[in-house]
Amino acid sequence: MAPKKDVKKPAAAAAPAPAPAPAPAPAPAPPKEEKIDLSAIKIEFSKQQQDEFKEAFLLFDRTGECKITLSQVGDVLRALGTNPTNAEVKKVLGNPSNEEMNAKKIEFEQFLPMLQAISNNKDQGTYEDFVEGLRVFDKEGNGTVMGAELRHVLATLGEKMKEEEVEALMAGQEDSNGCINYEAFVKHIMSN
Protein backbone atom coordinates (compact mmCIF):
# COMPACT_ATOMS: atom_id res chain seq x y z
CA MET A 1 0.00 0.00 0.00
CA ALA A 2 1.25 3.33 -0.95
CA PRO A 3 1.50 5.93 1.71
CA LYS A 4 -1.32 8.39 1.78
CA LYS A 5 -0.60 11.67 0.23
CA ASP A 6 -1.59 14.79 1.93
CA VAL A 7 -4.26 15.93 -0.41
CA LYS A 8 -5.04 19.56 -0.08
CA LYS A 9 -8.67 20.29 -0.17
CA PRO A 10 -9.62 23.10 -2.46
CA ALA A 11 -10.40 26.26 -0.55
CA ALA A 12 -14.09 26.64 -0.06
CA ALA A 13 -15.53 29.19 -2.34
CA ALA A 14 -16.26 32.40 -0.54
CA ALA A 15 -19.86 32.44 0.61
CA PRO A 16 -21.87 34.88 -1.41
CA ALA A 17 -22.73 38.01 0.50
CA PRO A 18 -26.28 37.90 1.73
CA ALA A 19 -28.66 39.92 -0.34
CA PRO A 20 -29.52 43.22 1.25
CA ALA A 21 -32.69 43.04 3.28
CA PRO A 22 -35.64 44.61 1.56
CA ALA A 23 -36.62 47.98 2.89
CA PRO A 24 -39.18 47.59 5.64
CA ALA A 25 -42.70 48.22 4.53
CA PRO A 26 -43.91 51.61 5.63
CA ALA A 27 -45.87 51.44 8.84
CA PRO A 28 -49.57 51.46 8.09
CA ALA A 29 -51.09 54.83 8.71
CA PRO A 30 -53.29 54.86 11.77
CA PRO A 31 -56.92 54.61 10.75
CA LYS A 32 -58.31 58.05 10.21
CA GLU A 33 -61.04 58.84 12.66
CA GLU A 34 -64.09 60.02 10.83
CA LYS A 35 -64.94 63.44 12.11
CA ILE A 36 -68.49 64.60 12.15
CA ASP A 37 -68.94 68.13 10.87
CA LEU A 38 -71.50 69.34 13.38
CA SER A 39 -71.86 72.68 11.58
CA ALA A 40 -73.22 70.83 8.52
CA ILE A 41 -75.94 69.03 10.46
CA LYS A 42 -79.43 70.31 9.77
CA ILE A 43 -81.52 70.48 12.93
CA GLU A 44 -84.83 68.76 12.20
CA PHE A 45 -86.36 68.97 15.69
CA SER A 46 -89.43 71.14 16.23
CA LYS A 47 -89.24 74.20 18.49
CA GLN A 48 -91.27 72.31 21.11
CA GLN A 49 -88.87 69.34 20.99
CA GLN A 50 -85.88 71.67 21.28
CA ASP A 51 -87.43 73.31 24.35
CA GLU A 52 -87.97 69.89 25.95
CA PHE A 53 -84.40 68.85 25.10
CA LYS A 54 -83.04 72.07 26.59
CA GLU A 55 -85.00 71.48 29.79
CA ALA A 56 -83.48 67.99 30.11
CA PHE A 57 -80.02 69.33 29.20
CA LEU A 58 -80.21 71.91 31.99
CA LEU A 59 -81.03 69.21 34.55
CA PHE A 60 -77.44 68.01 34.06
CA ASP A 61 -75.95 71.49 34.59
CA ARG A 62 -74.15 71.29 37.95
CA THR A 63 -72.70 74.80 38.00
CA GLY A 64 -75.54 77.07 36.90
CA GLU A 65 -73.62 78.10 33.76
CA CYS A 66 -76.12 76.42 31.40
CA LYS A 67 -73.29 74.08 30.35
CA ILE A 68 -72.42 70.41 30.82
CA THR A 69 -69.07 68.64 30.68
CA LEU A 70 -68.22 66.48 27.70
CA SER A 71 -68.35 63.45 30.00
CA GLN A 72 -72.07 64.15 30.59
CA VAL A 73 -73.03 64.29 26.91
CA GLY A 74 -73.63 60.52 26.66
CA ASP A 75 -75.86 60.60 29.74
CA VAL A 76 -77.94 63.46 28.32
CA LEU A 77 -78.20 61.76 24.92
CA ARG A 78 -79.46 58.59 26.61
CA ALA A 79 -81.86 60.54 28.84
CA LEU A 80 -83.37 61.93 25.65
CA GLY A 81 -84.14 58.47 24.29
CA THR A 82 -81.15 57.72 22.09
CA ASN A 83 -78.89 54.77 22.76
CA PRO A 84 -75.41 55.64 21.46
CA THR A 85 -72.37 53.54 22.31
CA ASN A 86 -69.53 55.23 24.17
CA ALA A 87 -67.55 55.11 20.91
CA GLU A 88 -70.34 56.97 19.07
CA VAL A 89 -70.45 59.61 21.81
CA LYS A 90 -66.68 60.15 21.64
CA LYS A 91 -66.87 60.34 17.84
CA VAL A 92 -69.57 63.02 17.89
CA LEU A 93 -67.48 64.91 20.47
CA GLY A 94 -64.44 64.82 18.17
CA ASN A 95 -62.56 62.08 20.11
CA PRO A 96 -61.46 64.21 23.09
CA SER A 97 -58.88 63.02 25.63
CA ASN A 98 -59.99 61.84 29.07
CA GLU A 99 -58.80 65.15 30.55
CA GLU A 100 -60.90 67.09 28.05
CA MET A 101 -63.93 64.88 28.80
CA ASN A 102 -63.92 66.11 32.40
CA ALA A 103 -62.71 69.67 31.86
CA LYS A 104 -64.38 70.99 28.70
CA LYS A 105 -67.97 72.18 28.79
CA ILE A 106 -70.54 72.79 26.08
CA GLU A 107 -73.72 74.82 25.82
CA PHE A 108 -77.07 73.53 24.60
CA GLU A 109 -76.56 75.11 21.16
CA GLN A 110 -73.39 73.00 20.75
CA PHE A 111 -75.17 69.90 22.05
CA LEU A 112 -78.19 70.06 19.73
CA PRO A 113 -76.29 69.10 16.53
CA MET A 114 -74.74 66.18 18.45
CA LEU A 115 -78.21 64.98 19.43
CA GLN A 116 -79.36 65.33 15.82
CA ALA A 117 -76.33 63.37 14.54
CA ILE A 118 -76.98 60.53 16.99
CA SER A 119 -80.73 60.59 16.25
CA ASN A 120 -80.01 60.35 12.52
CA ASN A 121 -77.98 57.18 13.07
CA LYS A 122 -80.28 54.38 11.94
CA ASP A 123 -77.90 51.68 13.17
CA GLN A 124 -79.81 51.12 16.40
CA GLY A 125 -80.51 47.59 17.52
CA THR A 126 -84.08 46.35 17.21
CA TYR A 127 -86.06 44.23 19.65
CA GLU A 128 -85.38 41.19 17.46
CA ASP A 129 -81.62 41.93 17.41
CA PHE A 130 -81.43 41.99 21.20
CA VAL A 131 -83.57 38.87 21.65
CA GLU A 132 -81.45 37.00 19.10
CA GLY A 133 -78.28 38.08 20.92
CA LEU A 134 -79.59 36.80 24.25
CA ARG A 135 -80.92 33.57 22.75
CA VAL A 136 -77.28 32.47 22.40
CA PHE A 137 -77.15 32.16 26.20
CA ASP A 138 -80.42 30.18 26.44
CA LYS A 139 -78.93 26.74 27.07
CA GLU A 140 -82.28 25.09 27.87
CA GLY A 141 -84.12 26.63 24.92
CA ASN A 142 -86.91 27.75 27.25
CA GLY A 143 -86.74 31.53 26.76
CA THR A 144 -84.61 32.22 29.85
CA VAL A 145 -80.99 32.94 30.64
CA MET A 146 -79.20 32.64 33.96
CA GLY A 147 -79.10 36.00 35.75
CA ALA A 148 -75.51 35.42 36.91
CA GLU A 149 -74.38 34.71 33.36
CA LEU A 150 -76.14 37.80 32.02
CA ARG A 151 -74.53 39.92 34.77
CA HIS A 152 -71.13 38.55 33.76
CA VAL A 153 -71.74 39.26 30.06
CA LEU A 154 -72.93 42.82 30.69
CA ALA A 155 -69.94 43.58 32.91
CA THR A 156 -67.20 41.98 30.80
CA LEU A 157 -68.11 41.96 27.09
CA GLY A 158 -68.50 44.76 24.56
CA GLU A 159 -69.18 48.11 26.15
CA LYS A 160 -68.66 46.98 29.72
CA MET A 161 -71.18 48.16 32.28
CA LYS A 162 -70.33 49.03 35.87
CA GLU A 163 -71.62 46.66 38.53
CA GLU A 164 -74.06 49.29 39.82
CA GLU A 165 -75.43 49.81 36.30
CA VAL A 166 -75.91 46.06 35.83
CA GLU A 167 -77.72 45.76 39.16
CA ALA A 168 -80.00 48.71 38.37
CA LEU A 169 -80.79 47.26 34.94
CA MET A 170 -81.55 43.79 36.28
CA ALA A 171 -83.48 44.81 39.41
CA GLY A 172 -86.64 42.71 39.69
CA GLN A 173 -85.96 40.71 36.52
CA GLU A 174 -84.90 37.34 38.00
CA ASP A 175 -87.35 34.60 38.93
CA SER A 176 -87.00 32.38 42.03
CA ASN A 177 -84.49 30.18 40.18
CA GLY A 178 -82.23 33.11 39.25
CA CYS A 179 -83.36 33.02 35.61
CA ILE A 180 -84.47 35.90 33.42
CA ASN A 181 -87.05 35.73 30.64
CA TYR A 182 -84.98 37.53 28.03
CA GLU A 183 -87.90 38.63 25.83
CA ALA A 184 -89.51 40.39 28.81
CA PHE A 185 -86.08 41.75 29.78
CA VAL A 186 -85.55 43.30 26.33
CA LYS A 187 -89.06 44.83 26.43
CA HIS A 188 -88.23 46.27 29.86
CA ILE A 189 -84.96 47.78 28.62
CA MET A 190 -86.44 49.21 25.44
CA SER A 191 -89.34 50.82 27.30
CA ASN A 192 -86.95 52.85 29.48
Curated annotation (Swiss-Prot):
Record carries keyword Phosphoprotein: yes
Keyword presence, Metal-binding: no
UniProt modified residues of type Phosphothreonine: 69, 85
Domain EF-hand: 48-83, 125-160, 160-192
InterPro entries found in the cross-reference section: CALM/Myosin/TropC-like (IPR050230), EF-hand-dom_pair (IPR011992), EF_hand_dom (IPR002048)
Residues where Phosphoserine is found: 71, 97
Feature: compositional bias, Pro residues: 17-30
Listed GO MF terms: calcium ion binding; structural constituent of muscle
Assembly with partners or alone: Myosin is a hexamer of 2 heavy chains and 4 light chains. Does not bind calcium.
Protein name: Myosin light chain 1/3, skeletal muscle isoform
